[in-house]
């Protein structure tokens, strides 16, 4: 089964302290994602190129099928599977705090990539 890599750009709001944002992601956001079997997530910061100094959330899923289970295709309505909601609990306060640091998530221009080679 081919892995899926979800690429989500993160645009910080003006005046946000980057170290506080990074610490929030590490202590509050990443542990929630890592509770869900079949996925992991990484916070990346651009080092060179067009997005140097900007952030990206990389969500790695073990397969297309697992991605579709965790995040059922629902058109424009974002959500997660009921069993995932039960596993992670109420994450509304985390996303409310996230919105104090950055624009909405997932970003409207995200892309999921299916690995075609190792």
Task: Describe the function of each predicted region.
Residues 11, 58-60:
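Short hydrophobic/aromatic beta-strand micro-patches
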Residues 1, 14, 30, 49-50:
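Mature, folded catalytic cores of secreted/periplasmic enzymes
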Residues 11-24:
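Short, surface-exposed ligand-recognition loops at beta-strand->loop->(often short) alpha-helix junctions
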Residues 8, 16, 105:
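Solvent-exposed, flexible loop/coil residues
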Residues 51-55:
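A short, glycine/Asx- and small/polar-enriched loop/turn
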Residues 27-42, 50, 60-111, 115-118:
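An amphipathic, aromatic/His-enriched active-site/gating alpha helix that lines ligand/cofactor pockets
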Residues 3-11:
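Active-site-flanking beta-strand signature of metal-NTP-handling nucleotidyl enzymes
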